[in-house]
Amino acid sequence: LQLADALEQHMPALLRANKKDLAAQDPDNPRNDRLLLNEQRIKNIAASIRKISKLPNPTGKIISKNKLKNGLQVEKITVPLGVVGAIYESRPNVTFDIAALCLRSQNGCVLKGSQEALHTNRVAVQLIKKVLKENDLPVDCVTLLPSEREVVQQLFTATRYLDVLIPRGSDSLIQYVRKNSLVPVIETGAGVCHVYVEKDAAINKALDIVVNAKVSRPSVCNAVDTVLVDEKIAPAFLQRLQAL
């Protein structure tokens, strides 16, 4: 909760850093939307952190137990993973998401963001470390790595330091990490979202859904990529969709 409060209090510093990152990009690149922070998006990140803080503690839960014939009690208990490595692209909100989730689940995290979000991520992690220090927690349990691509190769072989590696981003990034990492990998979804328009669908409502699923934020990984249309409704639906 303190992290969410601190994020809102230090919003100007985060916005200044984000402007530096945006100024270094091609202004016509549609992917800049992934990098962009504004007041509302920062408030949304803070709200997400508050939701995470209210999640039940996932550690220390007894999943199963049984007693052996010799009297030994055997229990399966949830424990932290340890140190989580995260590789992700130019989405500053991911820095806060991963840090908050790892702290809630009593894991440390090593963050490898993209060069595009360098200044934003630095300020974000400085803010996180400030809150950790104020609560007498080890500040290095959230660590930001240099943004150079060479660092990724080092993460792949860091079996002594990382317990799991999580890539978050495009399908090409996820597959590259999965194929090359010696550290165990948790593979996330890569988007490629589909919308299916059924033959009895209400055309106006279906059009609204398809347009919103793509146009509202084209850069996010859960934006629609493929529209499948039943052949019985295809002529009418596709004509209306094309007219948009």
Across the structure, where does each feature detected by a protein language model lie?
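A structured beta-alpha segment of the ubiquitous adenosine-cofactor-binding alpha/beta core
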Residues: 38, 51, 69, 73-76, ...
